[in-house]
Amino acid sequence: MKVNKVVQIHKGSNSVGGVFIYEESITGTVVKVNKKSIRVHMTHAKCTTNGRVTREYDINETATFDFWKTINRQFGENAGKTVDIYKNSKYGIIEVVH
């Protein structure tokens, strides 16, 4: 992970079938990298409900995301890759591919 790298932060709730009912995607830039956490300056957010964009807005906030765990992703855009997951209780999670 490098400083000034653009990252996507994801947060949402899903239904029984695993399809997201509500999802929020935030775009941000990494400001600081430590061994067990990263600090991200967030600039833009997009909210979707049932696949439709319901709200899009600009934000100007900085938050720290703590290292949670390393996993081998089985599905999604990072399928077959090892990723580190950082999380923040208010904003969601960031996946960083090795």
Regions found by a protein language model. Give the residues of each.
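Short coil-to-beta transition motif at edge beta-strands of beta-rich domains
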Residues: M1-I21
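Glycine-centered tight beta-turn/hairpin loop motif at sheet-sheet or coil-to-beta transitions
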Residues: I21-E23, Y91
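Enrichment for repetitive, rod-forming helical segments
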Residues: G12, R39, I59-T62
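Intrinsically disordered, low-complexity, charged/polar segments
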Residues: A45-H98
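Basic/aromatic-rich interaction segments and small domains that mediate binding to polyanionic partners
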Residues: E24, T29-V53
